[in-house]
Amino acid sequence: MADYTASALLAAQAKITPRFNEAEMRERQNPILRVGLQNQDYIMQDVSSIKQSEKRTVKGYQFKKLAATNGTTRSHNFTGNQGDTQEVTLSWSTFTETLGMFGQVAADNVEQYSDMLANQIRQKQIIIRERIGAALIAALHAGRTAVSNATVRNATFNSSNNAFEINSGDKDQFFAFMRSVMNQHKYYGGLDVMVDSVLDPIARKIAAQGSANGTNLSYQLQNMNIMPHDTLGTDVAVSAYPAGAVAIALPANSFAFIPWIPARYRNGQGMLLSDIGIYASMPDDSGLPLTYSLRGYAERADGSSNGGTVDDVKINWQLGVDVATQIGVISTANETPIYEFALTT
């Protein structure tokens, strides 16, 4: 039962310092979330001012690629086809977490009420960040390209898994071959690369083999942003590659994570100590450019079994954020800029 009785003032006690409590509060590293947030203006500028309601869709428009006409002669009466645009609709998901506290729970407790509440909110923000990061990895994997050049060098395209496979004997050149495959598909610039727990140490080893070493391997990682994410290869892409060694690569700035909360939370309204409650917002405590919706209301409650009193007041809270995970769109059916790679035996 969650009642804070373990820290109630029943014996001589002291609070554990926050640093000593870090193991309990550890958080899965999430570099892809930070990059996705940084990329949001590359997709569409100031989405929050465009989307005014949960019921309102947000659509963007981009030019379609023109088809080649492959002419070989000149003429006086040539004709041409007009270009076109395509519509891109942002798809939104909502992430929420709830918590609650009895008003008198801190009256006889070594922990203060404000510290209890701040700790619960911090933990719920951690959970939301981890959920969003995992969802973003899953979305990238699900949206990987199913289209490849007819001939590919330095890798084999597995059309069943929609992945470019590189032989394990070439693991020291894995990222060079990845770059080669991307170049063959006309992606010559910077790459954002998510690697699983198997490829992460391989990438670290390659990065350590610089020009001063007898074997220079670090050149492979130039203009690549390598981001380890252990969701990949453990929760995502496991059925196709149970031994792991999976990576997802895509051109820099071609995916974004776009956060949003409704105007009633941004503007704020209501009164907390009522059954109607309040609408408010709060920033992310880790420094990410995330704003959470915060809903709270009070209710009469018997808190005697939860560290409070029989005539207590319980305040219920809900944190939330709406997000759109957007990936660069290509008009060719089943083609995307997301390329999955795997190291195979």
What does each model-identified segment do?
Residues 1-48, 340-345:
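N-terminal alpha-helical "arm" segments
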Residues 173-214:
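Structured, hydrophobic secondary-structure cores that serve as assembly/anchoring elements
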Residues 104-184, 340, 344-345:
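Alpha-helical scaffold segments that mediate packing/assembly in large oligomeric complexes
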Residues 2-3, 163-169, 205-345:
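Sequence/fold signature of self-assembling virion shell proteins
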Residues 93-107:
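Residues forming anionic-ligand binding surfaces in small-molecule and nucleic-acid pockets
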Residues 144-146, 198-201, 285:
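Short, internal active-site loops enriched in acidic
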Residues 27-97:
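Assembly/oligomerization interface modules of large self-assembling protein complexes
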Residues 101, 182, 190, 199, ...:
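Extended low-polarity, hydrophobic cluster-rich segments
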